[in-house]
Amino acid sequence: SNADGTYSGQMTLRTAVSKSKNTVAWKIYRDDITPKAGIGFLLNMGFHKIWMDKSTNAAALGGFTYGVSTEEMAGAYATIVNDGEYRQPTCVEKILNTSGKAIVDTSKRSSRVYDTNSCRMMTDMLRTVVTSGTGVGAEPSNAIVAGKTGTTNSNKDAWFCGYSQYYTTAIWMGYDYPKTLSSVKTLAIFKDFMYDIHKDKKKVEFKTANGSYTKKNQTETETQSQTEEQTTTQQETTTVTPTTKAAT
């Protein structure tokens, strides 16, 4: 169902994402992407408790039999900001031998999941969530972020997953035995955490998509060449995916 429990008629995908109109996500998942392809994307990003034969159309709304972890969600969102390249979340970045040679370098382990331009368009829409949608209040003063809110019926679970050009963070709030949350503070937790880890970082804008797409309900064409420095920024700064869990 939609986050506000109402139907708003036809709308752009940007509006649907920013206002959490889940009927749009469900229709795209069922009719355009197809459940087989949609679940396939998740399997390619290390979601370990999802099985194709147990997934229904409810998967478009996060309705999985065994659920997902914050680590898996952080890895998936990091794939978007990394231009479609999935890297398995890990605590180990690099291991050097006594000669200083890298014998383990996790930054070089990646696999292609999404098209680069599609990821940049998705980031642009997730940016709207933070600036004027359900995620207003999540952005720290020292970073530019994009992300998405998530809730279950009766507010028994609350999520916020988001990222900057430097870090990706997934927040979950809930009880071991599900019951309604008295208050939801995922946005505040995300904002405070991201503020702390960006204290020594410069604000960096997200990379821009090329081509025609809908922005702020108007069709625009944007073509922006990326400099070598812009292209490599993400590869140098997002080798670690911080993940945090919060429970009341």
Where are the regions a protein language model picked out?
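Active-site-adjacent helix/loop patches that line small-molecule binding or acyl-intermediate pockets
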Residues: S1-K49, K54-N82, T128
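A penicillin-recognizing enzyme superfamily signal
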Residues: S18, G67-E229
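Extracellular mucin-like PTS domains
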Residues: T221-A246
